[in-house]
Amino acid sequence: MTPGLLTTAGAGRPRDRCARIVCTVFIETAVVATMFVALLGLSTISSKADDIDWDAIAQCESGGNWAANTGNGLYGGLQISQATWDSNGGVGSPAAASPQQQIEVADNIMKTQGPGAWPKCSSCSQGDAPLGSLTHILTFLAAETGGCSGSRDD
């Protein structure tokens, strides 16, 4: 065998092809992940409290009873603790407040705590959520995992 017949270029071709495939998959994954993060960030910014179907959350949280006071430390249709109510502009008891007053305080809670304040039921607020909004994403995820039935187990 003559020296020089096997070249490093010839031996490296399968490795180059594999490297290109791995690189392509990595880049495509990075692009998709970046788009998802950007979408989530934009949807959080553009998602307004008006996009939330508070009646659906109340139905999930308290069976739609806006005057709920079951003794579990959570009050009103949206099942808000007294401390959270007070720190977000509520006056008196959530159970004694009108649905509109509860929604106004809930809007403040949503701004500071996000949908995590209602971990199970916020994804049930399908309403007219814009495509890509946080409510839309949560609704989709809840539907996929079978959430949205019953009330929160606090």
Curated annotation (Swiss-Prot):
One of its GO terms (biological process) is dormancy exit of symbiont in host. GO terms for cellular component: extracellular region; plasma membrane. GO terms for molecular function: hydrolase activity. It is an enzyme of class 3 (hydrolase). Disruption phenotype: Not essential, disruption of rpfC alone has no effect on growth or survival in liquid culture, nor in mouse infection models,although colony size is reduced. Alterations in gene expression are seen. All 5 genes in this family can be deleted without affecting growth in culture, however triple deletion mutants (rpfA-rpfC-rpfB or rpfA-rpfC-rpfD) are not able to resuscitate spontaneously in the presence or absence of O(2), and are attenuated in a mouse infection model. Might be a good vaccine candidate. Its EC number is 3.-.-.-. Factor that stimulates resuscitation of dormant cells. Has peptidoglycan (PG) hydrolytic activity. Active in the pM concentration range. Has little to no effect on actively-growing cells. PG fragments could either directly activate the resuscitation pathway of dormant bacteria or serve as a substrate for endogenous Rpf, resulting in low molecular weight products with resuscitation activity. It comes from the Bacteria. The chain crosses the membrane at residues 21-41. Belongs to the transglycosylase family. Rpf subfamily. CDD domains: RPF. Keywords: Cell membrane, Hydrolase, Membrane, Transmembrane, Transmembrane helix, Virulence. InterPro entries: Lysozyme-like_dom_sf, RPF. This is Resuscitation-promoting factor RpfD. The keyword Cell membrane applies. It is a single-pass membrane protein. It is found in: Cell membrane. Induction: Expressed in actively growing cells.
